[in-house]
């Protein structure tokens, strides 16, 4: 069966409360005495009554046709999460007539499209709504229909309302009908454009009760900028949101949008890959964007793992790859901008602050200062030929932390290049200026406003389910989770058009989703539009389940990207926090869409050559032809997969990294004892029996079987793992299965990773195929490091699907409010058609 797809929310004018669990919503209308509306006599007070004559019947029936149809029971129109008992049947209240004005408690007059407080439970803040309908029911009761605003604390960010301005609320599409007497107080809510400059405050917001610049849609917890036409429609029917400064703000946003569209016309974009690993996420994003017609290029990448950086640089020689921490990278970006300002390449209102930056005073005769350095040991004088690099941190762990320049010395080659602190090169201003100007022109480092897309998955060891020592109470205090703060700080500094963050689904589970809520709140604080969802790798053409959390961000001038719907059938597994279950990207249950069959292990790796436990070669040749569409596609070289027409016959299809972790002699002997059949594991070893409750134990009275080394065949850790209930230790995979999740380790001690027919664990290449890496994607480092690179990666087909959605949004091709996007038929194995000049 296919997983369920959630329907987008639509208008619902029933008596049903807001359908999303645990989110603040008005209560059902209270029961009132069933009596017709009477004329108010002098001295008599009623809780609520309508004013003026009713709206003409023809106009009312045209505006609210459902109110005048015969009474019938039908399912609700709006749905955002899984159905509850209250969703089964809802009766639409039939109207006798509609009104434009009402008075409550003989003191407060309300008109259509007014904003108001609505009574809530005792001791709780009142609800906030826009009145979109007022009518007398056929039963004689008085009603109004509310379209609800959400306070920040009522949204997915919850406690991180502290990051949001106090008066800010979010407009939803959720509507329901309540008794008129529940109206409590009239409000002044300003509908304003979402401003990219978070430091700029529109003066009119100081005198209002609340202001609203974003919609909040429950499906996929989407925060989207209010469109200008929406504000105009509201202002036409209301006296609010008409201040001159608000209109000017809207015009400013419009100008930004037009400028963005001119840039988009070139269909080119730059990408920064943070925590890049070996580059899977950016590789997939660029592949998918290209299929949408956008030429997305990974211009910069950062990771602290040297082996991963080498892998990325080899496969993407066009990328500026930096092996450094994200913290140091942020410091470097700030110092680079200062240098650009100092050399008048970039404007700044405080440019005078950088006049003597690092001792590089802007004096003309500074060029006469010697650019030489004397070696104290032998008296040799070195002359700076040119500056060839820049870095921040502690190069080779030898010097103090700071900004360093890489120097090429006159009459020496690059093997003698050295890193020198910039303060020691203050007499080389001319050389530094030359380097900075060349670097600025070529874009060796991104500058604020100069990046189109930032992607990355901040390290998740502190929240991963594979980490048994997680800080459950305050995850942001865990040093392993601090990178989430750094990631958001880099986004805030660079202000890219689009942001895509990836992480494990445990981000939603641990501490009630604390870190995920923080990430959403932080992006909203920066005035990014936001959408989050979960995607399973197997639903996009892999023999691996691998569910991951993704968070989109987009500037107000852009369209927030959608999530791509699955291309392959897949049965979902695992437990998801109830509140986020509806955020899984999937089709509705019972849908009629024809999805491709799910891929199995045999579809993915059956064509690979047999290798032994001791195999160490980095390159080998194929000995079989591919037999499945996946195998044919994954073998394509980069030039073939990119749609290039210039196929070099001299290039051969090479298979990289098809060698397994070389197991020690004891583990190898154990693997050889695992039967070659489905479901086999250590429980098949001699002397192991399964007792009550599926708990394993050793057979009593029998001597334990020993290995050649003298150690026991059945290790104690296998008997005690998960209290003896696990079947994972030394588990053998089978051809008709899918892998739950490719991880960073290859030891078979507590996972099912043994090859179906060979006495070894899955090779690095087999794991890489399960992640969707092309066969020609070469990895670097020791075997364990290669497994880590593959296990930490975002599945390439998932990133490819997201790249297509990104490209569609970037080019302004996304239409409608649906948070989900249908991919083209055959997308999984689709190759782009390049223009002739690029082919």
UniProtKB/Swiss-Prot annotation:
Q: Which regions are flagged for Basic and acidic residues bias?
A: 51-70
Keywords, comma-separated and alphabetical: Chromatin regulator, DNA-binding, Methyltransferase, Nucleus, S-adenosyl-L-methionine, Transcription, Transcription regulation, Transferase, Ubl conjugation
| Function of the molecule | Involved in the CpXpG methylation (e.g. CHG cytosine) and in gene silencing. Methylates preferentially transposon-related sequences. Functionally redundant to DRM1/DRM2 to maintain non-CpG methylation. Involved in RNA-directed DNA methylation.
MF-aspect GO terms? chromatin binding; DNA (cytosine-5-)-methyltransferase activity; DNA (cytosine-5-)-methyltransferase activity, acting on CpN substrates; DNA binding; ubiquitin protein ligase binding
- Provide the family line: Belongs to the class I-like SAM-binding methyltransferase superfamily. C5-methyltransferase family.
Supply one GO BP term.
negative regulation of gene expression, epigenetic
PTMs per UniProt: Ubiquitinated by JMJ24, subsequently beingargeted to proteasomal degradation thus initiating the destabilization of the heterochromatic state of endogenous silenced loci.
Q: Which gene encodes it?
A: CMT3
Q: Where is this chain compositionally biased, Basic residues type?
A: 19-30
Q: Which NCBIfam families match?
A: dcm (TIGR00675)
Subunit composition and interactions: Homodimer. Interacts with HP1 and, through its chromodomain, with the N-terminal tail of histone H3 doubly methylated at 'Lys-9' and 'Lys-27'. Binds to JMJ24.
E.C. code: 2.1.1.37
Subcellular compartments: Nucleus
Report the protein name in the record: DNA (cytosine-5)-methyltransferase CMT3
Q: List the disulfide bonds.
A: none
GO annotations of cellular component type: nucleus
Name the phenotypic consequences of knocking out this gene. Reduced DNA methylation (e.g. CHG cytosine) at least on FWA, QQS and SDC loci.
Pfam families documented for this protein = BAH (PF01426), Chromo (PF00385), DNA_methylase (PF00145)
The protein's matches in InterPro entries, at most eight in alphabetical order, are given as:
BAH_dom, BAH_sf, C5-Methyltransferase, C5_DNA_meth_AS, C5_MeTfrase, Chromo-like_dom_sf, Chromo/chromo_shadow_dom, Chromo_domain
SAM-dependent MTase C5-type domain location: 269-813
**Major localisation:** nucleus
Instruction: Please write the reaction equations for the catalytic activity of this protein.
Output: a 2'-deoxycytidine in DNA + S-adenosyl-L-methionine = a 5-methyl-2'-deoxycytidine in DNA + S-adenosyl-L-homocysteine + H(+)
- What broad class of enzyme is this? transferase
């Amino acid at each position: 069966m296919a997983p369920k797809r959630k329907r987008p929310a639509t208008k619902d004018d029933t008596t049903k409360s807001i359908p999303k669990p645990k989110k603040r919503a008005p209560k059902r209308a209270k029961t009132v005495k069933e009596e017709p509306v009477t004329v108010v006599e002098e001295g008599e007070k009623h809780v609520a009554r309508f004013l003026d004559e009713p709206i003409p019947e023809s106009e009312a029936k045209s505006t609210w046709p459902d109110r005048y149809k015969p009474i019938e029971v039908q399912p609700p129109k709006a749905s955002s999460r899984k159905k509850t008992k209250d969703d089964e049947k809802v009766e639409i209240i039939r109207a006798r007539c509609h009104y434009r004005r009402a008075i409550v408690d003989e003191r407060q007059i309300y008109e259509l499209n007014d904003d108001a407080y609505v009574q809530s439970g005792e001791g709780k803040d009142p609800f906030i709504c826009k009145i979109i309908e007022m009518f007398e029911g056929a039963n004689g009761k008085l009603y109004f229909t509310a379209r609800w605003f959400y306070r920040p604390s009522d949204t997915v960010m919850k406690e991180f309302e502290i990051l949001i301005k106090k008066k800010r609320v979010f407009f939803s599409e959720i509507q329901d009908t309540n008794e008129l007497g529940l109206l409590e107080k009239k409000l002044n809510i300003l509908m304003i454009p979402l401003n990219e400059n978070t430091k700029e405050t529109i003066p009119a917001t100081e005198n209002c009760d609340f202001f609203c610049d974003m919609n909040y849609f429950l499906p996929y917890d989407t925060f989207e900028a209010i469109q200008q036409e929406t504000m105009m429609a509201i202002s036409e029917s209301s006296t609010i949101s008409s201040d001159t400064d608000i209109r000017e703000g809207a015009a400013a946003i419009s100008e930004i949008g037009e400028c963005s569209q001119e840039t988009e016309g070139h269909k080119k974009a730059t990408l920064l890959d943070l925590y890049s690993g070996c580059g899977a996420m950016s590789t997939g994003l660029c592949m998918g964007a290209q299929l949408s017609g956008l030429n997305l290029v990974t211009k910069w990448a950062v990771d602290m793992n040297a082996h991963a950086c080498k892998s990325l640089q080899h496969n993407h020689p066009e990328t500026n790859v930096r092996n450094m921490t994200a913290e140091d990278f942020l410091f470097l970006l700030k110092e680079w901008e200062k240098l650009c300002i100092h050399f008048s390449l970039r404007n700044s209102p405080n440019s005078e602050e950088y006049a003597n930056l690092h001792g590089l005073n802007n004096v003309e005769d500074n060029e006469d200062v010697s650019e030489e350095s004397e070696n104290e040991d032998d008296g040799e004088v070195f002359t700076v030929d040119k500056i060839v690099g820049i870095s921040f941190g502690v190069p080779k762990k030898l010097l103090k932390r700071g900004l360093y320049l890489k120097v090429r010395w006159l009459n020496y080659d690059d093997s003698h290049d050295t890193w020198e602190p910039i303060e020691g090169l203050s007499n080389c201003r001319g050389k530094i200026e030359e380097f900075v100007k060349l670097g600025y022109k070529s874009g060796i480092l991104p500058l604020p406003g100069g990046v189109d897309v930032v992607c990355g998955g901040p390290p998740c060891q502190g929240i991963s389910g594979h980490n048994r020592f997680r800080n459950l109470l305050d995850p942001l205090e865990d040093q392993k989770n601090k990178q989430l703060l750094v990631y958001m700080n880099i986004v805030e500094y660079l202000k890219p058009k689009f942001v895509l963050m990836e992480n494990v689904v445990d981000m939603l589970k641990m501490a009630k989703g604390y870190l995920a809520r923080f990430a959403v709140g932080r992006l909203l604080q920066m005035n990014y539009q936001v959408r989050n969802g979960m995607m399973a790798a197997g639903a996009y053409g892999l023999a691996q389940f691998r569910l991951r959390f993704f968070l989109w961000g987009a500037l107000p001038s852009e369209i927030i990207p959608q999530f791509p719907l699955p291309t392959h059938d897949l049965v979902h597994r695992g437990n998801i926090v109830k509140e986020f279950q509806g955020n899984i990207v999937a089709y509705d249950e019972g849908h009629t869409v024809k999805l491709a069959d799910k891929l199995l292990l045999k579809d993915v790796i059956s064509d690979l050559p047999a290798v032994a436990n001791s195999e160490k070669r980095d390159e080998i040749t194929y000995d079989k032809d591919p037999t499945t569409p996946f195998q044919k596609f994954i073998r394509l070289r980069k030039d073939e997969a990119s749609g290039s027409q210039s196929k070099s016959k001299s290039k051969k299809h090479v298979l990289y990294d098809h060698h397994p972790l070389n197991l020690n002699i004891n583990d190898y002997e154990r693997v050889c004892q695992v039967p070659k059949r489905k479901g086999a594991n250590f429980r098949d070893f001699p002397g192991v029996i399964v007792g009550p409750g599926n708990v394993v134990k050793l057979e009593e009275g029998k001597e334990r079987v020993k290995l050649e080394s003298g150690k026991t065949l059945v290790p104690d850790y296998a008997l005690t793992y998960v209290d003896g209930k696990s079947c994972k230790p030394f588990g053998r995979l089978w051809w008709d299965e899918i892998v739950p999740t490719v991880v960073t380790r290859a030891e078979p001690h507590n996972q099912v990773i043994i090859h179906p027919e060979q006495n070894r664990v899955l090779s690095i290449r087999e794991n890489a195929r399960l992640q969707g890496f092309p066969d020609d994607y070469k990895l670097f480092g020791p075997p364990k490091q290669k497994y880590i690179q593959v296990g930490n990666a975002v599945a390439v087909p998932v990133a490819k699907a997201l790249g297509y959605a990104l490209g569609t949004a970037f080019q302004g091709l996304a239409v409608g409010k649906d948070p989900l996007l249908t991919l083209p038929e055959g997308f999984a194995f689709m190759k782009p058609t390049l223009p002739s000049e690029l082919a």
